[in-house]
Regions:
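Short internal alpha-helix immediately C-terminal to a glycine-rich phosphate-binding loop
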Residues: 110-130, 137-149
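Short acidic low-complexity segments
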Residues: 175-187
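Structural motif
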Residues: 132-133, 158, 182
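N-terminal ligand-binding/catalytic initiation module
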Residues: 1-107, 114-116, 126
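Acidic/polar active-site rim loop that often engages polyanionic ligands
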Residues: 2-4, 147-151
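NAD(P)-binding Rossmann-fold cofactor-contacting core
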Residues: 149-175
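General structural feature for long, well-ordered alpha-helical segments within catalytic domains
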Residues: 14, 18-21, 111, 138, ...
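Conserved beta-strand segments of alpha/beta enzyme cores
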Residues: 2, 154, 178-180
Length: 187
């Protein structure tokens, strides 16, 4: 069994790898050769946390996996991300665990890739403005991934705590895109 710690994930997978994997699994799901099992998510009655399991199976690639994790709203004050998860991969023929993988970076990359795949296939080709609602941990991942899909001319964003938009503004500047913080009504 392989154990891949969180600290090693970013060096092992790129945004393009994530995009390709998500696009492939979306295609497999549309073809009904891959599917998700029902999600289990519950409040644990401690630390105001939500905890759950997401799992799925790809019959063609024989990928069987489970993500265990949740949301701990007090983690930011402890220097941790609020979302915490671990991924388990299993041998589809035997059920034996093949790998335990740190899931926080993978979750952010997968979520960003899903947004990017959606934009690549569904957004207007001439889209010029990217609107973002929310500035949580995954927002910068999503901005980078989605910005690669169109020739956006500017980014507009809203967050219920406007001071948290600075990380998105920094990424927009890194990408050479003007950034504007807007009210919910303006968005």
């Amino acid at each position: 069994m392989h154990i891949i710690p969180e600290k090693d994930i970013a060096a092992l997978i790129t945004r393009q790898d994530s995009f390709d994997a998500v696009e492939k699994v979306f295609s497999s799901m549309a073809a009904k050769t891959a599917y998700n099992f029902p999600v289990i998510r519950e409040a644990i009655g401690h630390a105001d946390a939500l905890y759950g399991f997401k799992s799925g199976f790809d019959r063609q690639a024989l990928n069987l996996g489970l993500k265990s994790g949740g949301y701990w709203p007090g983690n930011a004050a402890k220097g941790l991300t609020n979302h915490q998860s671990t991924i388990f991969l299993f041998d589809a023929d035997t059920g034996k665990c093949r790998a335990i993988v740190g899931g926080n970076v993978l979750t952010a990359l997968r979520t960003a890739a899903a947004a990017a795949v959606s934009v690549a296939h569904l957004a207007r080709k001439d889209a010029k403005v990217l609107g973002i609602i929310g500035a949580g941990h995954q927002a910068t991942f999503q901005l980078r991934a989605v910005a690669e899909q169109r020739k956006f001319e500017r980014i507009v964003a809203w967050n219920r705590s406007p001071e948290k938009l600075s990380a998105l503004a920094d990424v927009a500047a890194e990408l050479g895109l003007p950034f504007e913080s807007v009210t919910l009504e303006e968005l």
